[in-house]
C-alpha cells in the first residue's frame, strides 16, 4: 500500500490566472516577481539573504517549467536544470474565491461553487445588529476597528486602546473573514477563543467563511507582536472532501499546522500544531515517521502568506522559499517505495503587489516519489485534480470532481 504527503506552500502562486483581471490582479505573479526583485538586487537584506533566488531542489522537480507554463516566462535569474525529476504542472482555480478555505477545499477535491459573504470596504465593515448581539453575548463593552485593515497595522494602532478599554479589535480584508485581535494576557487567550466561537455562530447567516483569532503580546505599539496561538473557525466544506473519504476507508489523516482549522476538524485523525515554517517542517517529518500505509500527511506552511505575502516583504518571502527548499532533502530521506509527495499552493499573495491581500494566480503542482516517472501534466483546470491523484495513489474510489494525473 502507499502513503501520501501533501504540502501547501500557502500563497506561493506562479501567475497567469486567466481571470485575474476580474479580481484586480492581472499581472500578479508571486514567484516571478520575487525572482525579478532578487535578480535585480532589490531583495538583498543584510544578514538574511542576497543575490538571485535560489531554489535548486524545487527547480529539479520542475518549478522552472511550471512557471513558464503558467505565466509564459522563466523566473529571472534562476537557472533551468537540464533534467527534471518530478511530475510538474500548474493548476487554475475554479472556485470563485481567492481565499484559504476555497483553495484548500478544492485541492482536497471539493471546489467552492457558491459566493462567500463579504464585508463592505466603505464605512463600518460589520452590521450593527451583529456587533450588538456579539458584544451582548460575549459581555464586552464594544469593539475597536470595525474596518478593513492589515493585522499588524491595526494592532499597532489600536493595541494600547484595546488594553485600556477591554474592547477586542475586529477587522476584515478582501477575504470572507472576521478577524479578532486581542492581548493574550490583558484580554486572555481563552476569552478570545470563546469570543471568536460566538462570532462564528452569529456569522453563519452572513455566509462568512472564517473567523480568525489573532492573539498578541507586548505593552506598547513598538513591542506588540502576534503569538503562535492563532486559531481559525471555519464553516464545514459544502460536501465530503478527500479527507472524509480517506477516513471512511479506515485511513488516517495527519493534519499539520492549520489544516485542522481549515477543514473545521472534519476528516481529521490527528492534529499536530507547530509555529513557523521550520517547526512545521519538523512536525511534518515526524508525521511521516508515524504515517502508516494508506495515510495522508497534510501540511500548510503558513509563513509565506501570513508573515511575508500580506506584509509585502519580498526579501523575507524569498528567504523563506530558500529555507523551505533547503529542507526538501530531509523529506527525500524519509521516503519509502510507494510514497508520493505533492507540493502546491492555495492562491497567490504577490509581495510586490499593491495592497495587502491575496492575488488571483495559478499554483504549482509538483509530485514525486520513488518510482514516479518525470513528466509534464500541463495546466490543469481546477485544483481538484490534486486530490483525485492522491485518492488514486492511495487506492480509494474517485470523487465527483477532478481528474487524476497519475
Curated annotation (Swiss-Prot):
Its EC number is 5.4.2.7. It is an enzyme of class 5 (isomerase). Gene3D superfamilies: Alkaline Phosphatase, subunit A, Phosphopentomutase. It catalyses: 2-deoxy-alpha-D-ribose 1-phosphate = 2-deoxy-D-ribose 5-phosphate; alpha-D-ribose 1-phosphate = D-ribose 5-phosphate. Pathway: Carbohydrate degradation; 2-deoxy-D-ribose 1-phosphate degradation; D-glyceraldehyde 3-phosphate and acetaldehyde from 2-deoxy-alpha-D-ribose 1-phosphate: step 1/2. It holds the Pfam family Metalloenzyme. Binds 2 manganese ions. This is Phosphopentomutase. The lineage of its organism: Bacteria, Pseudomonadati, Pseudomonadota, Alphaproteobacteria, Hyphomicrobiales.
